[in-house]
């Protein structure tokens, strides 16, 4: 009887040990969170190229859990960032702040306990986090020089954005070096809302163009160098009303909008940069604190429209004439 009691006790102990032992848990799937710009996606240009890179990466790596977040404001994005930084877990995590308008909400924030943060298109350094910028000066200088036969209008979404100001200066410097024509600057809004004002852009340009015509300053063919983000389609909408303007394509090749209006496009290939960063993340490679890319990289380029022939201008020939000089100007500018 005593023997049977001992055996029963051993069986009970074994059963308890068996129930308490769990099978080896599978590692948690990598988690990628993207806080997109407040102007959102669907602009057919800058933001959409970033989304292309992110979705392409996730298609190649289905094990990655992707979360896209659309904040209503920069303050809302700050709350989402704080929530992400405070979260804990075992998964390998990465957060992308997909707009340089989020610089202030990241500045001074500690590194996450697990995971990493990347903010796009900023010249600033954020200790504990990573950032990169695709320099615009060289490509914008080349664009300005290629626009030598036009009166230029630099059309900005807002003032004070470092990336926009660098682009504007590059275009102005390149145009001045190659042309005696004037360059003017228009500004759409007084803040980041200028990146998402398609309808207002149409009305703004209609009014400003009428003022421009009656000012006595305008002469020659007019070319817009747009730094508008998601507001750019509004300018192309206006070009269907006024066929006498020309528009530099921006962020992506815009020739398809109207090959007779777009002499060239300044293409920013953020999707290629992001793919490199995300592949390094999965491979366990640490991200640099900060990186810069310029005209000599594959990440920014000016694409001439070979169909464009207004006044017999050869965009490809102009590109070849000024490319090397633009590279040197960018190097000097960075010093």
Mark where each language-model region is:
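Periplasmic-binding protein-like
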Residues: 34, 89-100, 120, 154, ...
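Bacterial signal peptide processing site
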Residues: 20-22
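C-terminal motif of bacterial Sec signal peptides marking the signal peptidase cleavage site
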Residues: 15-18
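An alpha-beta-alpha
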Residues: 54, 141-188, 289-311
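Extracytoplasmic "Venus flytrap"
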Residues: 33-53, 57, 61, 69-74, ...
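Hinge/cleft segment of the Venus flytrap/periplasmic-binding protein
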Residues: 279-335
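Hydrophobic alpha-helical segments within soluble ligand-binding/sensing domains
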Residues: 131-153, 266-286
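Flexible loop/hinge segments that line or gate small-molecule binding clefts
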Residues: 110-135, 252-259
